Structure formats: structure tokens, C-alpha cells
Amino acid sequence: MMSKIVAIQGDHLSKLNPITDTSIFLANEIQNKNYKIFYYKPENLSVINSKIFAEGFFIKFNYNKKIFFKILKKQKLNLTKCKFILIRQDPPFNLEYISTTYILETIKDKVKIINDPTSIRNISEKLYSIKFLRYMPNTIFSQNIDEIKKFFRKNDRVVLKPIHTFGGNDIHLLDKFDLKFIKKFIKKHDHIICQKYLSKIYKGDKRVFLINGKIAGVISRVPKKGSFLSNMGKGAKAVNTKLTRIEKKISVLVAKNLKKENIFFAGIDFIDEKLNGDINVTSPTGLKTFYDLSKINLAKTFWEELKA
């Protein structure tokens, strides 16, 4: 029988920052509705006798304590006993990540899983943006040196990005074509993204939260002095902002596409009214930061849309 249990598949609790973490923010909201929170790491997911189990802990989150969680009970839980499962571990989107989507996929008709594991597997966070290239800065996806060299000739400054990392990791701004560096970068990452640098990033990007196919909110993230990276983990500062008419139009289009793909919760980013190509569906963040700025609780919206 299904119980009022929300399972969270996430990174080690020691990696979570209660001041900003979206997983904790979502868990705190739903535990106030008398749901139990079961937390486990991806490596503790197993298939035993055709049933899906996870070894983890029933926990209680508390924002007011120095230690922000209390372990109530360790347990091996049959995940079909849950009402919801949140896939919340950070990328890299590697074989272990993919394996968990195959395992959870087998029970998605019995338990509501956010985001849908099949959809997470099918939607590469950066490659999916190929559908929306007309709304992006000049961008190519390639590991062909000649094509990359041509791209540099047409664009003064170029941002190089890996396809399967996250959080602004290993992103570089090049003022000119550097064969040695680019060869090394390709050897490490295979296909890479080359994108025209948009100088207005110094004013900040915009992170748009999409919930159940609709625009739910937006914040701006301003890079720290001397940086072009707008990720909070790289020292950027969050501020209130609004979407322009163009950004709203593009956001609605992306949101509708993602809903068709069974993506319930996502984050997309704009720089100077252009999508930057990151369509975050694995573990979208920023809801707690948005609440701190606006006092609008999108965790409440999240669970209301799920009819929890």
C-alpha cells in the first residue's frame, strides 16, 4: 500500500547547504503536510527479486537547528511504498546516473517520480537546447578542430563548455583560438560547446523556474567581480528581476516542450534575452534563494501542482 512517503535520491547530506539547497526546501515544505522523508544515495539503489529497494534513512529536516537534519531510522525501503520520488543528485550525467534512471523507470507507473527518469535520460541538459538554437547566441557543438577554428574566426571571444558537467565547472572564455588548449579540452570532454561570448553577462543572467509547464519565477545571478560565471556556487550574487516580453515568449515555448517530454520541474537561463543553452532537468536549484528574495514559496507551488 502506498504511504505518505517522499523518497529523495540525492548526494551525501554533508554536501547540502541548508541556506540555499532546493532539495531541503522541497522536503521541509512537504514534511509540514505530514509526509515522511526517506533519503538515500544513488549507489544504495538495488533490484532484488524484481523489486526496487533503497538503503537509506527516514529523516526530519529543521532549518532552526545547527545540524539541519535528524536521522529517525535507518531502513531498506521498497520504493513502491512511496507516493513520490525526487531525483535530486547533481550531475555529472555519467553511467551511474543513467543506470539509476533505468532502475527507477521500472516503477514509474506505480510511483510519481520527479523528474520522469526516462525523460531525464533522453534530455541532455545542453544538447536538448539544439531545438532552440534560433533563440541562442552563435553556438556550435563539435569536436572537429577545423569547425571550431572557423567559429573563432567569426566570433571575437568564445566560451567553451563541456556538455555533461554542471555548476559552471570547467567553463572557459578564450580571446583567440588556442589549438593546444582546445585539443586538450576535447580530449577530456569529447564533443564541446563553443558559444559567442555575451558581454552583458557582467550585469547578470536570469534563471527561470518552470513548474508543470508554466513559468513559476525568476532570479538574476550577477557574477562576482572579475568573473563571467553566474553560478551561485562560483560566487555570483542573486537579485530580484523580471522577464522581458521576449524572455517570457521563449520561456513559455520551452516550458510547453518540456511538459510534453514529461519534465515537471526545470530551470532555464538567459543572458541578454538569449537562452544560454543550459536546460536544467536533473536537479534544478534556486527555489530557496528565490524565496529569500521574494518571499514567494515555490516549494508550495511545486507540491500543489503535484496535488500532494
Indicate where each model-derived feature is located:
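Short glycine-rich anion-binding loops that position phosphate/pyrophosphate groups of nucleotides
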Residues: 12, 89-92, 163-165, 284
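Redox-cofactor binding/interface segments in oxidoreductases and associated redox assembly factors
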Residues: 8, 86-87, 195
